Swiss-Prot record:
SUPFAM superfamilies registered for this protein in UniProt: L-aspartase-like (SSF48557)
Catalytic activity, reaction form: 2-(N(omega)-L-arginino)succinate = fumarate + L-arginine
Primary enzyme class: lyase
Domain of life the protein comes from: Archaea
GO molecular function, one term: argininosuccinate lyase activity
Name listed for the protein in its UniProt record: Argininosuccinate lyase
GO cellular component labels: cytosol
Subcellular location: Cytoplasm
EC number from the UniProt entry: 4.3.2.1
InterPro entries with a match to the protein in the record: Arg_succ_lyase_C, Argininosuccinate_lyase, Fumarase/histidase_N, Fumarate_lyase_fam, Fumarate_lyase_N, L-Aspartase-like
Gene Ontology BP terms: arginine biosynthetic process via ornithine; L-arginine biosynthetic process
Keywords: Amino-acid biosynthesis, Arginine biosynthesis, Cytoplasm, Lyase
Length: 493
């Protein structure tokens, strides 16, 4: 007969290996084993405080739980004969303390609310790690950008040369994208950090549990009030996967550019050797493998997100076992994201950007012709669309000298630019990269002064975000410290 204390009375007969394999969540539960011990401790502190469990029984149980907390969940608890880690831990506790003691830990609780609570604790911790990593990445981007205020390069649309920008301006675009990823994750954390504990199977319990108390001990911001929603909903997992999918999409876009920029025919950047590999046959190769794998990670997490949301979409209230199959997708999707962020930060920080090559390309491909058209509008009062036609015709004809522009002006405006006072000097000045950059000084533009202002503003925003994380981690740490203090008091250690 199975050793699982949950199963042995109601159900008889040994399960086949196939059934055990299908129903077991043990591998995925490795992610929440330590969280389960914390949940057990908080629940037991509350049961003792509410005089539901006698202090002597609580003392015996808490000693074992503290041992698990300090030494780690024993390998025996992960035996595949248990359906999940919760049954494994309870079985071991019952064996060590006896049925009269160990059997009291689960009073007023179901695995439904227990699992949901553990999932939220672990997801919360992962999100906080990701948020910290994002602040490091953003700090790197701001630091590298500060070194490249005047490093000119072409900006692209459709992967074609478009207008001159600076490397600093380009990097600030990504920093701003990653700041929104931070905002999304931090906002999601508000909905993740809610306690289902005390909801039991679906209809709460007749025991006088103190749900807000256990929520405080575990560092939650509040309880999930409706007990059915608390155990049946996994939108916190779906939302976290969605946020991380968008984050990795932004990482993928950046990596795509680094891959292109590091190619022999572009040569905008030289990636540090640590982030590259060579070929097993071609000795000259330096392949941007880390960037390529990071680019591919979007596909992995998108698959996890789609799988998770599809599992949930047809489930009636309240708990259904289908939800167990969501957990591996959650962990597969989100557990590697902090590493991905850190790798990108390291890759950017250690990269060498080729200022000369960027400058060579900055004025190629007609990148400054927009400024020429704008000059005709600003200084000579030509309608913009007409100026656009005049310059576009000159580009098509292959020359941007005054003679060629005059021909276009006569065709589209009925008079030459020369007759309006336009000189070759006006044209040459408008076509210079420095002019194109210097006039684009609106907030968020690539002009050096505008970039310096943006850097200062972004640093302020980053400092605020770092403070947000620090405050949240301090709050959670204080709660867990109080939990351990009360647990040790009960265990009289």
């Amino acid at each position: 007969m199975t050793r699982d204390v949950v199963r042995k009375a109601r159900l008889s007969g040994e399960r086949t290996e196939d059934i055990e394999s299908l129903l077991s969540s043990m591998e995925a539960d490795r992610n929440i084993a330590s969280s389960d011990v914390l949940v057990d401790m908080a629940h037991l502190v509350m049961l003792t405080r509410q005089q539901i469990v006698h202090e002597d029984h609580a003392k015996t149980l808490m000693k074992e739980l503290l041992c698990m907390y300090e030494s780690g969940v024993p390998a025996e608890a992960f035996d595949p004969s248990y359906e999940d880690i919760h049954a494994g831990i309870e079985t071991i506790l019952t064996r060590k303390t006896g049925g009269d003691v160990g059997g009291r830990l689960h009073i007023g609780r179901s695995r439904n609310d227990e699992v949901a609570t553990c999932l939220r604790i672990r997801t919360r911790d992962i999100i906080l790690d990701q948020l910290e990593a994002l602040t490091r990445l953003r700090s790197v981007l701001l630091s590298v950008a500060a070194d490249h205020i005047t490093t000119v390069m072409p900006g692209f649309t459709h992967l074609q040369h478009a207008q001159p920008v600076t490397l600093a301006h380009h990097l600030l675009a990504y920093e701003q994208m990653f700041s929104r990823d931070f905002d999304r994750l931090f906002d999601a954390l508000r909905r993740v950090n809610c306690s289902p504990l005390g909801s039991a199977a679906l209809a709460s319990t007749g025991y006088p549990l103190d749900r807000p108390f256990t929520a405080d001990l575990l560092g939650f911001d509040r309880i999930l009030v409706n007990s059915m929603d608390a155990v049946a909903s996994r939108d916190f997992a779906e939302e976290t996967l969605a946020c991380d999918t968008m984050l990795l999409t932004n990482i993928s876009r950046f990596c795509e550019e680094l891959i292109i920029w590091s190619s022999a025919f572009v040569q905008f950047v030289n990636l540090d050797d640590r982030y590259c590999s060579t070929s097993s046959i071609m000795p000259q190769k330096k392949n941007p493998d880390v960037a390529e794998i990071l680019r591919s990670r979007t596909g992995t997490i998108l698959g996890s997100f789609v799988s998770a949301i599809t599992i949930v979409k047809g489930l009636p209230m309240a708990y259904n076992r289908d939800l167990q199959d969501l957990n591996p997708h959650l962990w597969r999707g989100i557990t590697g994201v902090r590493r991905d962020i850190d790798l990108l930060a390291g890759m950017v920080e250690s990269a060498t950007f080729n200022r000369e090559r960027m400058a060579e390309e900055a004025g190629r491909g007609g990148t400054t012709t927009t400024e020429l058209a704008d000059t005709l509008v600003r200084e000579f009062n030509i309608p913009f669309r007409t100026a656009h036609h005049i310059v576009g015709k000159a580009v098509k004809d292959g020359s941007l000298d005054l003679v060629t522009l005059d021909r276009g002006a006569e065709e589209f405006y009925g008079k030459t630019l020369s007759s309006l006072g336009v000189t070759q000097k006006n044209i040459d000045s408008a076509l210079s990269v420095s002019t194109s950059l210097s006039v684009r000084k609106l907030p968020g533009g690539p002009a050096p002064d505008a970039v310096l202002d943006a850097l200062a503003e972004r640093r302020k925003e980053l400092e605020k975000d770092i403070e947000l994380i620090c405050d949240k981690k301090t709050q959670i740490s204080a709660s867990l410290h109080e939990l351990l203090t009360q647990a040790r008091r009960i265990a009289q250690l």
